[in-house]
């Protein structure tokens, strides 16, 4: 909502004070003082005056007296020093136009200044008159100074006396935004935005804050998000555009194409909240009934097979098709660890106070979900503890995420007899038959120790505990698709508590995500038709070829690598396949029955379709044209066994890739991302696969040692950075991404310099081309994250936090130091910079 529109509607008289309201950033406040993301700042005012106290008897003890706040008495002052209202008893705020808003305190937080009254969140409780304050919904009081009650002079003899103290505070007045609406076209945002910068920061001290400080002030984390970034905003724009597509295709028009009918009916079923609410736990009743009828562990194979198909292989262990590490041209069966409800095995094994608190809250959540399925509180509590015991045992038997980065630790070929010997209690023949597979005699068992522990558990754990475990995982996997009681409980723990997200996302956002997740290439087909032209694909491919040429030149001149290893590296580089925008062949979903009145059923049928499609690959040649992301996705990836880089259409949009912008920021941003994905083929994990995607050591011993030495330099650097509180980056987990960030930006700089070597480049907006390159690089990463979510990512995410992805790279590049005249001794210049590629 712009204030100009508001003045036309409401006849406001304070245009000079409020004309820039849409540009007022909300303050940084504790979580309990945050305003719902449906609201926006209408007005910011400084309140200066007095807090007036009355000497009164304490409640419940008439012999004791204390100063009690009676009322504020303050003037409201605008940014230019003009009077814009009064603040008085109620509490009430009144504008010169006669409009008033009364507030009711919702939450408070201690002021950083111990000598000041607390910060407050108030909700509008009353309105009077039309004008400035008639649309206000929330008020925040922040940045308080003074105003505390007197400490002396109040006793029985002074009963009724008044005393006042001077105070001032900043007040933010909020009103409802114009509701989010579907987009008919994608909005434009430049890849380099000067207003996103903070010129008060020295780029040689903190380049990330210099480049992104303005963005951070303008873009507080929305209340339905655990983090917010440039990529998040682009994702939301894409989602709003997809929303428009889905609303249109959801209309039962007989002229709809097959693809439009599929995605439209799926979306319509999801948006029918009244129908979903009536289902309760009904959509999982068949699964729960099958679990209830289990007589022994011997009956598990059929139930597990069904749930693996319906839950994407999540219960107890994982079973899937994947490329053979020894021969990437074919798919074989993979059996791996699984069965956990928390995001990572470390949540079960760490002994710090926060981890113990999370486990306690998790058990309470499991209990609550079991109660929603009809269990008594006492029985559900007992079952939740048993479930925690099972999952803890599975977690302790699982590899850490760092260990999983070594493909050799995940490569253990076995025949069926060997797999059966690991878990005698589980009949694999029955499991395969129930999964729709014939007899298989070749498996990669990624973690044999896990299956040994699973056998111990199967033999020792009471059947009743296993039934409780299975019921929990059924409802856990399906919670988001059930009635509101399950949706809300699931969000309360995993969203609000674990990640610190104050509010659930609106229904339309979730439904867009579900369509993209289950019918992604159908939705992507329509997205591409409307957003991604051949010119964008051609430009991206041209830049990719330039980055590949830079990497070829880089490999050839590496002083630390032998000629033998260089030849193998070049062979691998020249074998990389570039996938840009969308797949050459679209997936056919026509065999999925989609019912406009059965949302949960649609989800399950789509998941079973995908599960069967994946399992059908076992024993067959690899389809090298397949994509692992849907076209609207705002992301990119490298696949070490496919040896390909993939850039969906969704990420090739402004501000990430900006055809209107000069080359420098585009190379700094998208060029760096292309280089990043290419470098993944040669990071600590990718380098272990050859040009064909096979797990094969093509390095000389001396070159491998030198690579490790250089990679250790990066790990040592990033291991010093703090994520949140006292938690440091797990730099062995993030090593691949950190190496790719650094290598990718070096390659992008080389390619940009080569592409523009015959051009005379001039400064733009006061910045040299080199400076614009690096600012463009930094601004792709502008973003913020809630503390709770940072803790999750410190354990689970192989990416470093955004500020270190920028500063960590820039500090290692002499080109950056030269561009901004930074000197050794400043934070953004490392005395001994790291470089791998």
Predicted regions and their residues:
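Bacterial N-terminal signal peptides
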Residues: 7-17
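Hydrophobic/aromatic-rich, well-ordered segments within soluble, folded domains that form packed cores
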Residues: 43-60, 196-217, 348-372, 735, ...
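Sec/Tat signal peptide C-region and signal peptidase I cleavage site
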Residues: 18-22
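Active-site-surrounding "flap" and adjacent substrate/cofactor-binding loops of secreted or lumenal enzymes
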Residues: 71-84, 88-89, 183-188, 202-206, ...
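Intrinsically disordered, low-complexity linker/terminal regions across diverse proteins
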Residues: 235, 387, 393, 422-425, ...
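Primary mode marks residue(s) on the alpha4-beta5-alpha5 output face of response regulator receiver
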Residues: 23-52, 59-178
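N-terminal module-boundary/linker segments of secreted carbohydrate-active enzymes
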Residues: 24-32, 38-44, 183-212
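Noncatalytic, helix-rich "gating/capping" subdomain that lines the substrate-entry/channel surface
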Residues: 247-546
């Amino acid at each position: 909502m712009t204030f100009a529109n508001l003045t036309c509607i409401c006849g406001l008289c304070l245009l000079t004070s409020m004309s820039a309201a849409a540009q007022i950033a909300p303050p940084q406040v504790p979580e309990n003082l945050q305003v719902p993301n449906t609201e926006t700042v209408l007005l910011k005012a400084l309140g200066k005056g007095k807090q007036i106290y009355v000497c009164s008897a304490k409640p419940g003890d008439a012999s004791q007296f204390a100063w009690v706040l009676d009322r504020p008495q303050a003037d409201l002052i605008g940014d230019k020093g003009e009077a814009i209202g009064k603040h008085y008893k109620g509490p009430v705020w009144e504008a010169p136009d006669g409009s008033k808003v009364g507030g009711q305190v919702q939450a408070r937080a201690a002021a950083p200044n111990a000598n000041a009254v607390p910060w407050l969140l108030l909700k509008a409780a009353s309105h009077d008159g039309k004008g400035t304050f008639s649309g206000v919904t929330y008020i925040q009081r922040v940045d308080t100074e003074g105003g505390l009650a007197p400490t002396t002079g109040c006793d029985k003899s002074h009963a009724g006396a008044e005393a006042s103290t001077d105070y001032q505070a900043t007040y933010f007045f909020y009103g409802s935004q114009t509701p989010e609406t579907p987009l008919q076209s994608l909005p434009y945002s430049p890849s380099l935005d000067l207003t996103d910068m903070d010129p008060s920061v020295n780029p040689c001290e903190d380049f990330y804050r210099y480049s992104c400080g303005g963005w951070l002030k303008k873009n507080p984390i929305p209340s339905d998000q655990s983090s917010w970034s440039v990529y998040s905003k682009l994702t939301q724009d894409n989602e709003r555009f997809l929303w428009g597509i889905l609303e249109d295709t959801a209309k039962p028009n007989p002229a709809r194409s097959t693809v439009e009918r599929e995605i439209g009916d799926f979306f319509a079923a999801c948006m029918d909240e009244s129908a979903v609410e009536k289902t309760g736990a009904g959509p999982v009743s068949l699964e729960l009934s099958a679990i209830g009828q289990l007589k022994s562990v011997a009956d598990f194979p059929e139930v597990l097979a069904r749930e693996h198909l319906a839950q994407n292989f999540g219960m107890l262990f994982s079973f899937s098709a994947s490329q053979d590490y020894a021969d990437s041209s074919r798919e074989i069966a993979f059996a791996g660890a699984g069965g956990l409800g928390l995001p990572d095995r470390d949540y079960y094994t760490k002994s710090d106070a926060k981890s113990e608190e999370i486990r306690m809250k998790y058990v309470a959540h499991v209990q609550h979900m079991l109660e929603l399925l009809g269990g008594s509180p006492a029985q559900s509590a007992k079952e939740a503890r048993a479930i925690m015991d099972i999952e803890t045992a599975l977690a302790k038997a699982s590899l850490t995420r760092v260990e999983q980065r070594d493909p050799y630790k995940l490569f253990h070929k076995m025949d069926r007899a060997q797999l059966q010997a690991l878990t005698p209690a589980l009949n694999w023949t029955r499991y395969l038959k129930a999964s729709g597979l014939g007899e298989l005699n070749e498996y990669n068992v990624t973690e044999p120790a896990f299956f040994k522990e699973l056998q111990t558990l199967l033999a020792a754990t009471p059947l009743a505990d296993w039934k409780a475990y299975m019921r929990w995982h059924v409802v856990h996997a399906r919670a988001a698709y059930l009635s509101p009681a399950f949706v809300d409980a699931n969000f309360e723990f995993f969203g609000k508590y674990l990640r610190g997200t104050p509010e659930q996302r609106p229904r339309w956002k979730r439904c867009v995500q579900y369509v993209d997740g289950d019918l992604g290439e159908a939705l992507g087909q329509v997205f591409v038709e409307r957003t991604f032209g051949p010119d964008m694909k051609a430009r991206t491919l041209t830049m990719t070829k330039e980055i590949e040429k830079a990497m070829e030149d880089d490999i050839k001149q590496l002083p630390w690598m032998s000629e033998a290893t260089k030849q193998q590296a070049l062979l691998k580089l020249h074998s990389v396949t570039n996938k840009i925008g969308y797949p050459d062949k679209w997936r056919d979903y026509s065999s999925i029955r989609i019912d406009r009145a059965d949302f949960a059923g649609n989800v399950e049928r789509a998941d079973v379709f995908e599960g069967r499609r994946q399992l059908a690959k076992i024993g067959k040649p690899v389809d090298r044209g397949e994509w692992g992301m849907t076209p609207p996705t705002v992301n990119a990836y490298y696949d070490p066994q496919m040896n390909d880089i993939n850039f969906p259409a969704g990420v090739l949009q402004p501000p990430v890739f900006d055809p209107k912008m000069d080359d420098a920021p585009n190379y700094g941003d998208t060029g760096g991302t292309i280089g990043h994905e290419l470098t993944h083929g040669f990071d600590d994990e990718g380098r272990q696969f050859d040009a064909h995607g096979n797990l094969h050591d093509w390095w000389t011993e001396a070159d491998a040692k030198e690579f490790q030495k250089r990679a250790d330099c990066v790990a040592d650097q990033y291991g010093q950075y703090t994520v949140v509180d006292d938690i440091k980056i797990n730099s062995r987990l993030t090593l691949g991404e950190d190496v790719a960030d650094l290598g990718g930006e070096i390659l992008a700089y080389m390619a940009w310099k080569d592409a523009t070597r015959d051009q005379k480049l001039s400064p733009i907006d006061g910045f040299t081309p080199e400076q614009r390159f690096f600012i463009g690089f930094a601004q792709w990463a502008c973003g913020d994250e809630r503390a709770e979510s940072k803790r999750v990512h410190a354990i689970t995410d192989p990416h470093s936090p955004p500020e270190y992805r920028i500063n960590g790279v820039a500090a290692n590049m002499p080109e950056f130091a030269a561009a901004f005249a930074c000197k050794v001794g400043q934070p953004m210049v490392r005395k001994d910079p790291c470089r791998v590629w």
